Curated annotation (Swiss-Prot):
Organismal lineage: Archaea, Methanobacteriati, Methanobacteriota, Stenosarchaea group, Methanomicrobia
UniProt: [4Fe-4S] cluster 3 binding residues: 580, 583, 586, 619
Protein source organism: Methanosarcina mazei (strain ATCC BAA-159 / DSM 3647 / Goe1 / Go1 / JCM 11833 / OCM 88)
GO molecular function, one term: 4 iron, 4 sulfur cluster binding
Binding site for [4Fe-4S] cluster 4: 590, 609, 612, 615
Family stated for the protein in its record: Belongs to the HdrA family.
Superkingdom of origin: Archaea
Name by which UniProt lists this protein: Ferredoxin:CoB-CoM heterodisulfide reductase subunit A
Gene from which the chain derives: hdrA
Alphabetized InterPro entries for the sequence: 4Fe4S_Fe-S-bd (IPR017896), 4Fe4S_Fe_S_CS (IPR017900), FAD/NAD-bd_sf (IPR036188), FAD/NAD-binding_dom (IPR023753), HdrA-like (IPR039650), MvhD/FlpD (IPR003813)
Amino acid sequence: MRIGVYVCHCGLNIAGVIDVSALEEMAGELEDVVLAREVQFLCSDSGQEGIIKDIKDNKIDRVVIAACSPRLHEKTFRHVMEKADLNPYLMEMVNIREQCSWVHADDPQMATQKAFDLIRMGVAKARFLRELSATSSKASRNVLIIGGGVAGIEAALNLAEAGFPVTMVERESTIGGKMALMNEVFPTNDCSICVLAPKMTEVQNHPNITLYTYSEVTDISGSVGKFHVRVTRKPRFVLEDKCKGCVDLCSEVCPVEIENPMNYGIGKSRAIYMPIPQSVPQVVLIDPDHCVGCGLCQLACPAEAVDYEQKPEEIEFEAGAVIVSTGYQLFDASRKKEYGFGKYPDVITNMQLERMLNSAGPTGGRVLVPSTGQPPESVAFIQCVGSRDKTVGNEHCSRVCCMAALKNSQMVKERYPGTDITIHYIDIRAAGEMYEEYYARTQGMGVDFIRGKVAEVYAGEDGRPVVRYENTLESRVEEEAHDLVVLSTGYEPSKAAEGIGRMLNLARRPDRFFASAHPKMRPVDAPVSGVFLAGCASGPKEIQVSIAQGSACASKVMQLLGTGELEADPMGAHVDPDKCIGCRTCVEVCKFGKISIVDKKAVVDEVSCYGCGDCSAACPVGAIQMRNFENEQILAQVRAATAHKSQCPFVVAFLCNWCSYACADLTGMSRIHYPTNIRVIRTMCSARINPEFVLEALKGGADGVLVAGCRMDECHYIHGNFDAKKRMDVLKEIIKEIGLDPKRLRTLWISAAEGERFSNTITEFVKELEEIGPIGSELKREYTATGLEEVAK
């Protein structure tokens, strides 16, 4: 083995504190190191060229780069390895800038010692580095889109135009979602169906789109590139290829009246009906729960499209990626009994008002008081019904309700100028483009706004609904009767979402909508590879945001499936079948469902493995390992650190790449100092930290161990830090049982932005360890190493 060590000056960023020449000399004396060199700027063109020349001239087969953070330049130096015809994963970076020179400028001597310790740890790991290469596999270019609302439509058209085959599955009998039911849309007051209908028709007619309406996804298995999908098409009892959409002929003869689900209880339809006039496809359906089987519609249909014997149809296909655009459902206003919905006919929801305002809706665009059939002279809107409300379990804001109420109040005012309109609100949230102007315009039209919660709605002596409310701006409780009360109901995840979430193993937010991989950096990526979230599937949002997310999802899919092949990250998990005992521990630990048991052995889906390492930490026999973060590699770092204990107390820290290690980097960038007593080992996730690593550090002489990961509920692998915390909590009890002070193991759950807190934690931990004393000092008998060794076994 021939290892080359390179130490970067980084101008004075490193060399201004650390004795770089001494590092070069000490590194050159390490076992297996055949070349050690200090360079002004390793990342410069000349620096990179020098490394390439050295590798070729000296037949170097491993490289250690002591410079800045691997989060900054790891890819840079991997490319250098490739140019030198060396496998890029035979290089290890050592962070002596952000986590050494920048945080220990007040103690150059110990900073130099710490830097050498880190280099020694890097060389120890380098001895166990293996050649890694990305593997590729064929991927289906077909894309499954679940949900045919505006977000799904936008994604489908973007993909289809780019040449990708798309299969759209919509559980309702028409695509278009809630937008297709609305009258006009804010803030421009465009006719909703006028702008949406052309896109709906384009979806139906596009040669690259296969559309299944009145259908549900019943099973999804497999993983990115090769999802196996099963869809059930429910019977319409009308043949799609024969129906001409001439609904009047069949509907007129039907003797049964029903409530059209698209009208939310306003008006009536027949048992054979068209969902909305602009339905896509233009095909009627029969409601089997109310149809009496009289046969009149079948006799009236000139196309012979009615088929009472139609059965559910099962369809199976492959998809390379999935876009979840399942939308939302409206809060059931009857759950707020104090508002009288379902009890008083003149208390309706905002969506019912939308259907009244729609010229193609059940009332032909007229707003009518249900009890009288006449236009209202006074209307009250009550905001936040079923949102921002702990009593119904919905503490979140539904984001759109304020603007929807403003829009509908404008519509009522325009059609019935003499109508008095009052909006009862907690806060008006008008934060989008042109929203504040829209709010001002509504006020200018004479709409009254009263800040405060509504206590109840009850029937007055004349039968009209009376609103009892607080006026917080005037500190009064008042009552007022209205002809019509409109409840602005909140948004909840759609009925389909729960099943889809189970099939795809999607995480949920506290508001029960699907959680993205990261709310800021990866807002449309699901935590599962090959799955993307668009529109209200990931929470309430406006139409324009849903459209933007549909386009974003399409772009992500194009990047993923553009070549028809998928490249697996070589640093995922892999199983040694000779060691595996088929215990299923890894299967249960992997929340992403990427491990299965085949022939009594664990098998990892390496193409879609996330690389968190949770499975590896849980494996009782060490059969499953994380490439580049294998047990022997990390243990080599631990032993190299503790074998030359350069100060007391001595702390070994395991930091996750995404938050705690990034936080340590930020601490350095902010020049926030902390004691030199800490030696950091990076893992991708805190879940990778095997209790064996901690015990090995303590057995080797470390006075304390710090395990740090992302804040709870913010782990980049969703569940990783929860599993890490459980393991460390148990380990603290074990440490206590063998006679050591459990305070020697400290955990920290921190964001990447909390540099001051990171520094304070290190400082406090070192002081605490000074009070406890050197490792084993609290024991009456000398059995520390023996006890730890037994526990490790």
